[in-house]
Regions:
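Acidic donor-binding segment of Leloir-type glycosyltransferases
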Residues: 38-85
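Donor nucleotide-sugar binding loop of glycosyltransferases
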Residues: 30-33, 58, 117
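Long helical/loop segments within the catalytic core of UDP-sugar-dependent glycosyltransferases
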Residues: 77-100, 123-198, 203
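N-terminal membrane-anchoring/stem segments of glycan-assembly enzymes
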Residues: 1-17, 153-154, 162-166
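Short, well-formed alpha-helical segments that are part of the catalytic scaffolds
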Residues: 4-10, 30-43
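Acidic donor-binding/catalytic loop of UDP-sugar-dependent glycosyltransferases
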Residues: 61, 110-127
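Short acidic donor-binding loop at the edge of a beta-strand
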Residues: 103-106
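Cell-envelope/extracellular polymer assembly enzymes that use nucleotide-activated donors
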Residues: 19-22, 50
């Protein structure tokens, strides 16, 4: 696993890989942010792309917004999920459903409240290939839209970085590792080998 604070832009220097990447986006009542997320994913500088949105028990306009993208771009798939087993955490269950419908050799799990740079996927895949790693996770830039977020996000980030220093989480002699659930890029075979999201099905932090 690689979780790094180092920029993955050097992945852009790697040869382009002609590989299908499936992006899975879990969405529970995300009408405020899902359009921005999807539009940024569809603008990726990557030829072979599948975007799967799992609308998880939504009661707002999330499904309608995704449907608009489905109708104009055949790379987008909408999956409607109406229930969640008691033994599963909601997000993990939605991600498992998305993975079951994925066709790619690489799986990218991306949160609905994110906005991707056009080079994100190419840089991340290039860096994963360069390092020969089965899981690549990134630290993202955070946007604070509310005073409460502006107060709490820096404190939470500092706490995480003290527990999981980016320059140490990849060392083989450390039992403690860390990956950011906002973006996790898996090799499909390895993801299935370790049990996928079923292995952490009742964990709030997957």
């Amino acid at each position: 696993m690689l979780s790094t604070g180092i920029s993955v832009r050097r992945g852009l220097q790697e040869p382009a890989v002609d590989e299908l990447v499936s992006i899975i986006v879990p969405a529970h009542n995300e009408e405020r942010v899902i359009a921005t997320c999807l539009d940024s994913l569809l603008a990726q500088k990557w030829d072979r792309l599948q975007v799967i949105v799992v609308a998880d028990r939504c009661s707002d306009a999330t499904e309608a917004i995704v449907t608009e993208r489905v109708e104009r771009d055949d790379r987008v798939t909408l999956i409607r999920n109406t229930d969640c087993p008691e033994s599963w955490a909601g997000k993990c269950h939605a991600l498992r459903i998305g993975a079951e419908h994925a066709e790619g050799d690489m799986l990218a799990f991306i949160d609905a409240d994110t906005e991707a740079h056009p080079d994100l996927l190419r840089a991340a895949v290039g860096e994963a290939k360069r390092r020969d790693t089965a899981l690549l996770s990134l630290l993202t830039d955070l946007k604070s839209c509310h005073w409460f977020e502006r107060c709490t996000q820096p404190v939470a980030t500092m706490a995480l970085m003290s527990l999981f220093p980016p320059d140490r989480v990849n060392r083989d002699d450390r039992a403690r590792t860390f990956a950011n659930g906002q973006f996790m890029l898996f090799d499909r075979d390895w993801y299935e080998e370790v049990g996928g999201h079923a292995a952490v099905k009742n964990d709030l932090l997957e």
